[in-house]
């Protein structure tokens, strides 16, 4: 396997909190997949949950070398946890088509958060 891309992002949690206070759930609707949305609505720390998902999706877009444009959308990158709790990525729509075109066979996700920040790194392999 070969590394196709690496992306990292850091999010200030207070910034996400301010956006939610200003515009309600609009950011969450734009960023989260349907499955993530269902979790977010009942999560005990919704701001932190959204900040971490946003960081992973930004990191993934950077790893793919595209950013969020040309038909790609945040909600096409879905973050979920495997049976051991490890964060993973599931792709939908244009993100899935791009991964298939690039020959992506594996995606690695790491996620960390502290009081003020959430950060994520994504590595994609062919």
Curated annotation (Swiss-Prot):
Gene3D superfamilies: 4'-phosphopantetheinyl transferase domain (3.90.470.20). It is found in: Cytoplasm. Its main location: cytoplasm. The keyword Thylakoid does not apply. One of its GO terms (biological process) is fatty acid biosynthetic process. Its EC number is 2.7.8.7. HAMAP family: AcpS. It comes from Escherichia coli (strain ATCC 8739 / DSM 1576 / NBRC 3972 / NCIMB 8545 / WDCM 00012 / Crooks). It comes from the Bacteria. GO terms for molecular function: holo-[acyl-carrier-protein] synthase activity; magnesium ion binding. Its cofactor is Mg(2+). This is Holo-[acyl-carrier-protein] synthase. It catalyses: apo-[ACP] + CoA = holo-[ACP] + adenosine 3',5'-bisphosphate + H(+). It holds the Pfam family ACPS. Mg(2+) binds at residues 9, 58. Transfers the 4'-phosphopantetheine moiety from coenzyme A to a Ser of acyl-carrier-protein. GO terms for cellular component: cytoplasm. The gene is acpS. Belongs to the P-Pant transferase superfamily. AcpS family.
